[in-house]
Amino acid sequence: MIVTDASFWVSALLTQDVHHGDADALLRRIAVEEIPVIAPTIAIIEVAGALIRRTKDPRAVEKSVRHLQLQPGLTLVPITAPFAEAAAKVAIASSLRGADAIYLTLARQEGLPLITNDNEILQRGAPFASVLTPTEWLRQNPGTEA
């Protein structure tokens, strides 16, 4: 089981993204091996915002967001008031943006690795949870393909 952030999903969904290859490879592994994935509900909003800024294509973005929400094995976790308080503490301690602290807090509370391509999370997240790029996760978890 893993936690994913918006940067992972954007890389997986946009073929022109510099990290698309490994993000797509991980997404295929998730599907084939039925790896459970969790993400906070804010991921939907962040993915939509990032995609529209990069593509300027509202229809394509809406389709991508629907595709994200229908991913098998993906559980979207709502943000409660106690969770928000915990994430605020992580934001303060790490100097991360609020949304980034939400992903990190979810990974910390669940005891799971956070898969991200976000440099700030990669640089500042380690004291709170295991933080890996898709490339690192794939390297640490070789597939069983023949």
Q: Model-predicted segments: where are they?
A:
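Residues that scaffold the ATP/ADP-binding catalytic core of kinase and kinase-like folds
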Residues: 11-13, 50, 124-125
